UniProtKB/Swiss-Prot annotation:
Family under the similarity heading: Belongs to the GrpE family.
Origin organism lineage: Bacteria, Pseudomonadati, Pseudomonadota, Gammaproteobacteria, Cardiobacteriales
CDD domains: GrpE (cd00446)
Protein name per UniProt: Protein GrpE
GO molecular function (one): adenyl-nucleotide exchange factor activity
Amino acid sequence: MHDPKESLETNIQETESQEKLPETPIIEEEPILTLPDDQINQLQQEVAELKDQLIWQKAENENLRKRQARELENAYKFASERLLKDLLPVIDSLNLGLQAALDTENEAVKQFITGSEMTLTMFQETLARHGIEEINPVGEKFNPELHEAVTMTPSEAHEPNTVIQVTQKGYLLNGRTVRAAQVIVSK
């Protein structure tokens, strides 16, 4: 009979001899690609141009993103401009009505004036909360960005180019002129 121990040892020895590999691996060398200098220079120039284009495109994208953010912010800030322009004649009429009624002695009219003044004050406070400012420049230097000169009149009590009377109040919305104040300016 065959001894299983001997058979196992023989198999192990055969396997070990088959597993031994040569100590130096065989490496196939690929040929090294060589290009002429002018072709290398041309490729380097193309790479540099592509890098410049990439940098320019990144800057352009960043500028576009900033511009869109600014436009969105402005759209939000000035969205109520049309509504304000429609409300300005109402405010003007309310102010004129109050001024005309101030000289009355009638007690009922005085109560109406008090209520109207309170309403106008609430209205102006609401406008102010939404970034709307009144331009009432009496005594200030004339500023063509904020004021529209209706007429000029000589005045010894005021320096030249000073607003001496407002004929119609102006309004700003978040710092931008919606309506310039109509004013009388000293000569």
